[in-house]
């Protein structure tokens, strides 16, 4: 079975299991996950599981990428902040949904991962994704405010700068916690009031940075 067929099967299974919207299904169906994972894991690229990408980091399981995209209610033209580029796969899926009129600003703490992701995204033609090396726990004020924000690593609490950089009527999805983690949906109304909702239990690598966990080691 070739990669295209494996990707089709994965997308169809997720569509049925998660009742995916057409836009999220099409994005998962289109983005070549095998090009984002290390060579030694290419054969497992379309298994619905996280995979190591080096530096103590992982590429999220496809079902979690799909769930986060659905929870964000991504729309064409959205400006999105991604905290934690990793290998760039999640950014590519998001970019497919927001389209050429949208934009994804992705912040990565580890320069080597950022460089690799930037090269893959560029080669695949994702001109609407900008990868920046920096402390994503502080957001990226230069491009704020954002329609949507999502974080791909677990924070001790919701970083204040991310709430501040979210547009009124915007939405954020972020895992919070240490040994026990919860996926939190944050919504900001037109007056700037914030409402939080707990989606459920998840498992992510820890967020590093000023508003992240201080004692994180990368091998």
Curated annotation (Swiss-Prot):
| Range of residues in the leader sequence | none
Name the protein family: Belongs to the methyltransferase superfamily. L-isoaspartyl/D-aspartyl protein methyltransferase family.
Q: Tell me its EC number(s), please.
A: 2.1.1.77
Query: Any keyword Cell membrane?
Result: no
Q: Name one GO biological process term.
A: methylation
Q: Where in the cell is it found?
A: Cytoplasm
PROSITE patterns, sorted: PCMT
Protein name as catalogued: Protein-L-isoaspartate O-methyltransferase 2
Which keywords does this chain's UniProt record carry?
Answer: Cytoplasm, Methyltransferase, S-adenosyl-L-methionine, Transferase
Q: Which InterPro entries match?
A: PCMT, SAM-dependent_MTases_sf
Q: What's a Gene Ontology MF term here?
A: protein-L-isoaspartate (D-aspartate) O-methyltransferase activity
UniProt entry tagged with the keyword S-adenosyl-L-methionine: yes
Q: What does this protein do?
A: Catalyzes the methyl esterification of L-isoaspartyl residues in peptides and proteins that result from spontaneous decomposition of normal L-aspartyl and L-asparaginyl residues. It plays a role in the repair and/or degradation of damaged proteins.
